[in-house]
A protein has these predicted regions:
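Membrane-integrated ABC transporters
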Residues: 1-35, 55-63, 82, 86, ...
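Extended non-transmembrane interhelical loops and adjacent amphipathic helices
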Residues: 1-8, 91-137, 199-242, 314-327, ...
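Transmembrane helix-loop-helix hairpins at lipid-water interfaces of multipass membrane proteins
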Residues: 22-78, 156-189, 267-270, 276-283, ...
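ABC-fold ATPase nucleotide-binding domain signature/coupling loops
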Residues: 122, 462-495, 504, 517, ...
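Cytosolic ends of transmembrane helices, especially the final helix of ABC transmembrane type-1 domains
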Residues: 224, 268, 289-325
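Helix-to-loop junction immediately C-terminal to a conserved catalytic motif
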Residues: 393-394
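C-terminal portion of ABC ATPase nucleotide-binding domains
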Residues: 471, 527, 544, 549-593
Length: 593
């Protein structure tokens, strides 16, 4: 069976994490298997003393009781220790597998991340390591918990079968039919897993939105509370309907197993009473057999429900996780070359590109060159391909046709990490990471403090940072640090630009990096960046044209092609589309007297 193969592989990973895992499971199996059988002897022994009391009956009963209590204490203590150790190893295994998953995602081609197709393909894989309830931990924990119960059921079933073979056969049939009922109920969940995952994502979204500080203002000012709560209730109702269907299916499918169990218990009771009457079973054995029957039913229900849900049902998530870890389809990085040294020229040669799952060509047979140390501006309306050129240049996406060259070398020939070293990129969306200010400037674990300070000064943040105590060593996330360093949106934008200043790369790319700054502040930033572009090939993108006057050349894109090209002065004299764009925006760059 498929889940047996998956469980075997997961156990192998757990044992590689900690070889003592074998001992923990072995002890749990031995103790769990024999404990119920041994403890069922207690009433038999006590009744035996009562029937033949002698002069020291009370002492013997106390000794028997004490012995069994001590035995139970030891068994429970060792079992609890083994269970805790299994749980510890299971979580260690989960974290190691989670680390492998993250490595896989980090090296996946950007196209899988950008449209979340990787999460559609492998959504269940992330559920396998997302918590310590199900998935990896659930399978290992419940296997260690149900394996000894199954062994115990075999032993108890053997004792019962020795007395009544028909009862033993019916109990086996009961276990099979009840397991089938549970399997069908779980199948209801598995068959609708995609829809359930979608609903779970919606529930998580509403939970996050309700407590999100950034959403709090609009929720209150626009009175969105009722709308959000109604939507949340609808999602919860959908989730409840799936659970209700599973419960109803379990009930219907379980009726046959319940009927078989009643018949088995009736036959066993009849056989036991007859054996008691003819003297082949004494009073103590009578109580022991009753105890064993009760234990069998309770243990069987628990083992089947837990095993079916936590082991079999969770297998699909763990299988998906292993599929993700094994696939080689997510990365097309097969480059072998190291980064280029010195100045770099760029060439787009007959490049055509459409984003995944679309037919619209964003770039259509586009060709242009950027000389070493030249600075160009890419301008045009939204959707004309400016940011797409950057995405292709840094190999986040790959052209459908044509090639992109650095110093005459196709970018596909470079190792991914070596290619990235050649670019200092600042994008419109600023991400602040839960590390220190120094780490967020350098984007490295260790950094040059003086170099970081110069970068901050170059983007005009020196005075703001000097207001803070130990600013460069302060974490920038309130989620991990109480005294986190907090910057405004515009200041975060400047911090992002300081990363490009800090990084020693031959190609500088600024894709709408001043979107959160006003026009005059943007002009000042670009004026400073103009002083820093020496010995760098630079590409500027901005809807606002504050940067274009500093560029050696301007490329205006329209319809996936170059519509206008030239210096600022040349295009202004041409009085074409660039002239109109710049003239309309010009008033925003003029300071008031």
């Amino acid at each position: 069976m498929k889940y047996t193969k998956t469980l075997k592989r997961l156990l192998g990973d757990a044992i590689r994490t900690d070889r003592k895992m074998i001992l923990y499971i072995l002890f749990a199996c031995l103790l769990g298997a024999f404990a119920p059988l041994v403890l069922s002897l207690m009433p038999k022994l006590i009744v035996g003393v009562v029937e033949n009391p002698g002069t020291d009956a009370i002492r013997r009963i106390l000794l028997i009781s004490l012995g069994f209590f001590v035995l139970e204490f030891l068994v429970e203590g060792v079992s609890l220790y083994c269970s805790n150790q299994v749980l510890t190893v299971a979580n260690k295994t989960r974290f190691e597998l989670m680390h492998e998953q993250n490595k896989k995602i980090a090296t996946a081609d950007f196209k899988y991340i950008s449209d979340r197709s990787i999460f559609k393909m492998y959504g269940m894989a992330f559920e396998a390591t997302s918590g310590d309830w199900g998935g990896v931990v659930g399978m290992l924990r419940e296997f260690a918990r149900t394996a000894p119960i199954i062994l115990s059921l075999i032993l108890i079933g053997g004792v019962i079968t020795a007395l009544s073979p028909l009862t033993g056969l019916l109990l086996l049939l009961y276990a099979i039919t009840y397991a089938y009922a549970q399997r069908q109920a779980n199948k209801e969940v598995i068959d609708n897993d995609a829809e359930i995952n979608k609903i779970s994502d919606e529930i998580r979204y509403y939970n996050k939105t309700a407590g999100d500080f950034k959403s709090g203002k609009e929720i209150r000012l626009f009175n969105l509370k009722d709308m959000i709560l109604n939507a949340y209730k609808n999602v919860i109702d959908k989730r409840k309907s799936f659970s209700l269907r599973a419960v109803n299916k379990t009930f219907r499918k379980s009726l046959l197993s319940v009927l078989i169990l009643i018949i088995a218990q009736g036959i066993f009771a009849y056989t036991l009473i007859l054996s008691f009457k003819n003297g082949s079973v004494d009073t103590g054995s009578f109580l022991m057999y009753l105890t064993l029957m009760l234990q069998f039913v309770l243990l069987a229900d628990r083992a089947i429900e837990d095993y079916e849900f936590f082991v079999v049902n969770q297998t699909i998530y763990v299988e998906n996780m292993y599929d993700l870890l094994e696939t080689d389809k997510l990365s097309s990085d097969h480059g072998t070359r190291d980064r280029l040294s010195g100045a770099v020229d760029i060439e787009f040669r007959n490049v055509t590109f459409a984003y995944p799952n679309t037919d619209k060509k964003v770039l259509d047979n586009l060709s242009f060159k950027i000389a070493k140390n030249e600075t160009i501006a890419l301008v045009g309306n939204n959707g004309e391909g400016k940011s797409t050129i950057i995405n292709l240049l840094v190999r986040l996406f790959r052209p459908d046709e044509g090639e992109i060259l650095l110093n005459g070398v196709n970018i596909n020939e470079f190792k991914e990490e070596e290619l990235y070293k050649m670019f200092a990129c600042i994008f419109q969306q600023v991400n602040i990471y839960p590390y220190t200010l120094g780490n967020n400037i350098s984007m490295q674990e260790t950094y040059d403090l003086e170099r970081a300070k110069r970068a901050i000064e170059d983007v005009g943040l020196k005075e703001r940072i000097e207001e803070e105590k130990n600013a460069y060593e302060r974490n920038m996330s309130h989620e991990v640090a109480k005294d986190a360093l907090e910057l405004s949106g515009g200041q975060e934008q400047k911090l992002a630009i300081s990363r490009a200043v800090y990084k020693d790369s031959p190609i500088l790319i600024l894709d709408e990096p001043t979107a959160n700054l006003d026009a005059l502040a943007e002009h000042e930033i670009y004026s400073k960046l103009n002083d820093l572009r020496e010995d760098r090939t630079s590409i500027y993108i901005s809807h606002r044209l504050s940067s274009t006057k500093f560029c050696d050349r301007i490329i205006l894109l329209k319809g996936g092609k170059i519509f206008e090209e030239g210096t600022h002065d040349e295009l202004m004299k041409k009085k074409g589309e660039y002239y109109e764009m710049f003239t309309i925006q010009g008033k925003y760059y003029t300071k008031e007297a």
